[in-house]
Amino acid sequence: MSEKNPIVGLCQKASFLISAAQVDQCPPDEGLEVAFAGRSNAGKSSALNTLTHANLARTSKTPGRTQLLNFFALDDSRRLVDLPGYGYAKVPIPLKQHWQRHLEAYLSSRASLAGVFLMMDIRHPLTDFDRLMLDWAQASQLPIHVLMTKADKLAFGAAKNALLKVRREVQQGWGDVATLQLFSAPKRQGIDEAQMVLAQWLGLLDEEQEAFEEA
């Protein structure tokens, strides 16, 4: 994005709002919010921190640490949501089932939810959890943008081939709601593209256009 990056400026003002174990504990369903989801150890926290230029999520080498829906306020009407990491073997099955039940309820009922970023490890894409997230997004006609994370773990050609392969399958099954791209937090690859999606979902591009037209 341009030097006048609206996302960076907004996220510098971000503050922790609340953690919720279930939908009825979430903040009032108004304004706009964007959620970040991903199977445990898919690089979700690193992606969230990198995109926002803020340490909004605790980056940990122990997957499954985030077990609640964590809301961050950007301003009075915009929020980011860090969703629980799923699939780690050390997490008890009843807890996984609890997460799944309340995550589905959140995705299907939250009117203020403008879109979801789904992190997939490029070396292990389209897991059962990934497919479930895509199915839920499609059922709710909710935009979902896939970040194929850890792209730096593969050679450039191999990463491109992996992207094309996954893109074909995603377009066939969920093409009406899903888009995807390569992403690497350490190499800062794909940040501008992802930030553009985030800015659009949060209505920041509309505000810039209105300001331009009024000038």
Swiss-Prot record:
Nucleotide-binding as a keyword of this entry, yes or no, is yes
Q: What Gene Ontology biological process does one annotation of this record name?
A: division septum assembly
Function in brief: Necessary for normal cell division and for the maintenance of normal septation.
Write the lineage as a comma-separated list. Bacteria, Pseudomonadati, Pseudomonadota, Gammaproteobacteria, Pseudomonadales
What is the native source organism of this protein? Pseudomonas aeruginosa (strain LESB58)
Listed as disulfide-bonded, the cysteine pairs are none
Q: Which cofactor does it need?
A: Mg(2+)
Q: Which residues bind Mg(2+)?
A: 45, 66
Q: What is the protein named? A: Probable GTP-binding protein EngB
Q: Which domain of life is it from?
A: Bacteria
